[in-house]
């Protein structure tokens, strides 16, 4: 019991006094937050609010101008090249547009991280890649398809399977439901919750999807004007009278996404389903 409580409060990501500038343009100004073990943490904000830049800084694709970013106990600014490679093996990333290579079939796309970071033989890599596809709800025959033959929902699942290839403890999701119909999006909702429940994954996601936020997010951080404007659960944010937060809960879309009972889905067409579309 004590071990479980300690894990729940363990800090997996710590951002302190983060500043990011491109010339005279300020992207982030004094941003600080923490993400705890096995938490589903969401970043939201309008276009140009710095969400994508922040994600890039968290996954070692970009350096902030100043401040501290610690991920899985490591200070990202202090890492050597070999340390950075080792740390990247401990997380997975699902990019917004999938990031799958069009010239490779799905099975080989999913197996790429294993080929890059392990010395396993090709047969075992293919077997492991097949297991990851099954884990995300895709049938074995999907592995033989090229990405162009996949539906939007299948593409998201295949991309997620690749992000899971190295059994990460931390998962980054960039707009995981973007472009999906409600049924397919509901499948992603269910899958995110299942992955956390089964493997204790810590999940950080960027999304504009209010239904997804209500369904799965433990806490949500709101970025606007280069600053972290608010952070809390969806019910806490919904009750907050803040100019950067209110637009997410006002208007037809905000009201439609908000459940009468936060414990139940607001949109019956969007109830979580594990069936891929």
Locate the predicted segments by residue.
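Conserved catalytic motifs of ABC-family nucleotide-binding domains
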Residues: 167
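Conserved ABC ATPase signature
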Residues: 146-150, 154
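Conserved ABC ATPase "signature" region
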Residues: 75, 123-141
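Helix-to-loop junction immediately C-terminal to a conserved catalytic motif
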Residues: 59
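Catalytic Walker B motif of ABC-type/P-loop ATPase nucleotide-binding domains
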Residues: 171-174
């Amino acid at each position: 019991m004590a071990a479980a409580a300690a894990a729940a409060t363990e800090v997996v990501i710590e951002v302190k006094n983060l500043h990011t500038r491109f010339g005279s343009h300020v992207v982030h100004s004094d941003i600080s937050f923490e993400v705890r073990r096995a938490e589903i943490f969401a970043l939201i904000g309008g276009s140009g609010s710095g969400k994508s830049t922040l994600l890039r800084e968290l996954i070692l694709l970009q350096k902030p101008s100043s401040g501290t970013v610690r991920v899985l106990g490591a200070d990202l600014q202090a890492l050597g090249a070999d340390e950075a490679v080792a740390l990247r093996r401990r997380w997975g990333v699902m990019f917004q547009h999938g990031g799958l290579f069009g010239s490779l079939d799905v099975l080989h796309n999913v197996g790429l991280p294993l080929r890059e970071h392990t010395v396993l033989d090709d047969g075992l890599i293919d077997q492991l890649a097949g297991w990851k596809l099954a884990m995300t709800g895709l049938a074995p025959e999907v592995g033989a398809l090229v990405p162009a033959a996949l539906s939007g929902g299948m593409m998201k699942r295949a991309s997620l399977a690749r992000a899971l290839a190295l059994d990460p403890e931390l998962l980054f999701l960039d707009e995981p439901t973007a472009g999906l119909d409600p049924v397919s999006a509901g499948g992603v909702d269910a899958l995110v919750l299942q992955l956390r429940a089964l493997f204790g994954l810590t999940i950080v996601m960027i999304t504009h999807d209010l239904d997804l936020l209500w369904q799965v997010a433990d806490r949500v951080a709101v970025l606007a004007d280069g600053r972290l404007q608010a952070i809390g659960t969806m019910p806490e944010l919904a009750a907050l009278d803040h100019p950067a937060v209110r637009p997410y809960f006002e208007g037809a879309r905000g009201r439609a996404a908000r459940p009468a009972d936060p414990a139940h889905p607001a949109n019956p067409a969007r109830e979580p389903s594990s069936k891929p579309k």
